[in-house]
A protein has these predicted regions:
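A broad structural signal for alpha-helix termini and local helix breaks/kinks
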Residues: 8-10, 134, 199-202
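Mid-domain beta-loop-alpha active-site segment that forms a flexible
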Residues: 1-4, 126, 190
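Active-site-proximal substrate-binding core of FAD-dependent oxidoreductases
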Residues: 199-227
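Flavin-dependent oxidoreductases
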Residues: 1-85
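Flavin (FAD/FMN) cofactor-binding core of flavoprotein oxidoreductases
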Residues: 15-23, 27-31, 102-181
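A conserved FAD-binding loop/helix module that cradles the flavin
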Residues: 55, 68, 77, 174-198, ...
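Generic solvent-exposed, charged/amphipathic alpha-helical segments
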Residues: 5-7, 127-131, 195
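Dinucleotide-binding/catalytic capping subdomain of oxidoreductase cores
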Residues: 18, 64-124
């Protein structure tokens, strides 16, 4: 959430900005834990944007959740009203002065934002989106909120959401922007790739190239990534 701000502070990636979205979840009671054998994902209603619609998630402990939505917020820490009010004016001015202006005035984006805000204000609205493919779910039986998380998506000067991670190398800094889930599930190989790039450019020195973490061996990962 702060990666763009750090880059901007040293005059890097000034053509990019970020917008923040809070993903919220609802936990289901135990009677639903055997409803499916796997998580179930729907086709996103707005495929031009980097969000998955609320889906059915089976956690490693066997519990199940519905979510997430993608509620626009004004801070990477915008979990409550006070934080969003504090950051509202500076974030709006930042967005209006960047490519995000084109995005927020786009009709499809406005439809997405309105839909996601509705799903945050109403539990039933969110759960009904999952009920389309799991009709046995009863919103009245789901009363416990799950964990929320905030992701920051990068927008370019043309008002387009950038789908991929951005690596920017400067003389005295190296920036990783727009690195979000589900890409973050490849964190260990990606970390090895970043370290390898820094090492090649003499921005990082290490003699421990045989380093190993559990089944992960640095040299083996790099060899496979560079094939």
């Amino acid at each position: 959430g702060n990666a763009i701000d750090i880059a901007h502070n040293i005059k890097v990636a000034k053509n990019l900005t970020d917008v923040h979205f809070r993903g919220e979840y609802w936990r289901t009671p135990k009677k639903y834990h055997n409803l499916t054998k796997t998580s179930v994902y729907s086709v996103p209603e707005f495929p031009d944007y980097p969000f998955l619609d609320p889906h059915w998630i089976i956690r490693v402990d066997g519990s199940c959740e519905i979510g997430p939505n993608a509620v626009p917020v004004f801070s990477p820490y915008g979990y409550d009203t006070a934080e969003n009010i504090k950051e509202f004016i500076p974030k709006v001015f930042e967005m209006l002065g960047s490519g995000a202006r084109k995005a927020i005035f786009d009709k499809q984006f406005q439809e997405l934002a309105f839909s996601e805000i509705q799903s945050s204000m109403s539990k039933s609205v969110m759960i009904e989106r999952v009920k389309k493919f799991l009709p046995k779910i009863n919103p009245k039986e789901i009363t416990e909120k799950g964990t929320a998380g905030i992701r920051s998506s990068v927008i370019n000067e043309n008002g387009k959401f950038i789908p991929d991670v951005i690596l920017l190398e400067e003389e005295t800094s190296f920036h990783i922007l727009n690195y979000n889930s589900p890409g973050a599930t490849g964190a260990l190989p990606f970390s090895a790739h970043v370290i390898n790039q820094l090492h090649k450019k003499s921005l990082f020195e290490s003699e421990d190239i045989e380093a190993q973490c559990g089944p992960w061996k640095f040299n083996d990962i790099i060899e496979k990534l560079e094939k």
